[in-house]
Structure formats: C-alpha cells, structure tokens
Amino acid sequence: PALQNDRIEVREAEPYTYCQFVVGRDHTAFGRARHPFMTGSSGWAYYAATQYLLGVRPDFDHMTVDPCVPADWRAFTVNRRWRGAMYQIHVTNPDGVEKGVASFRVDGREADRIPVRPAGSVCRVDVVMG
C-alpha cells in the first residue's frame, strides 16, 4: 500500500512507481511491492488524469476540454504539446463546480473545441467551468 512508501524495508520498491501488485495481508511478505516497471498502471493513471480529470481530450481533428475536478479546485493550467503545437490551457472554476463548462475561448474567440494548429505554433485556451 502507498502508506508504506516510507518503509523501503517492507515495500522494496521505489516510492514513485506504480507496481503491478502489492502482496496481501495473508502472506508473510505483506506490503512488498512487485514488478514496478512491468505494468501499464502508470500509463493508464496518466491517461485517466489528463483526459478525464483535467478533461483535455485529443481527437482526430480537434481537442476538447471537459474537466471533472474537486469543487475546491479554483483554477489549473495544462501545457499540452499535440501534433507539434503547444496548447496553453487555463481553466478557472469561479463557482466551485465539479463538472460543466460555461465558456470556452480559443485564442480569444468563442469556441466549442480546439482545432489542430500548425506545428510550432502556440494556442491559448481559456475555459470557465460552470
């Protein structure tokens, strides 16, 4: 379990890794973590966090932003490189909602999604939750 990250003699794995499994309570090696670099867990955690919590989802010809965050998150920024362009996405949450988009601006213009920009360009996206 993550609570044992500070007990390397028990965990026997680096605290920054997602291990494939942690030995259960009924085993004599309870708490020992195994196969830290032979798992897809970290990739799936990144995918879930960026695309479904922060809500930045690329598609074939556009990208959308639809966050689902704790109500006490008042703002966050995501810098996302996609197809050679840099997308600077700033999300504000003035009403403390957990989901929903009240306004969406791409480079200062109202929009409902982010079009693909040329490689090397920078795109500014402002999202207000509500």
Give names to the regions the model predicted.
Residues 1-130:
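Non-catalytic C-terminal accessory modules of carbohydrate-active enzymes
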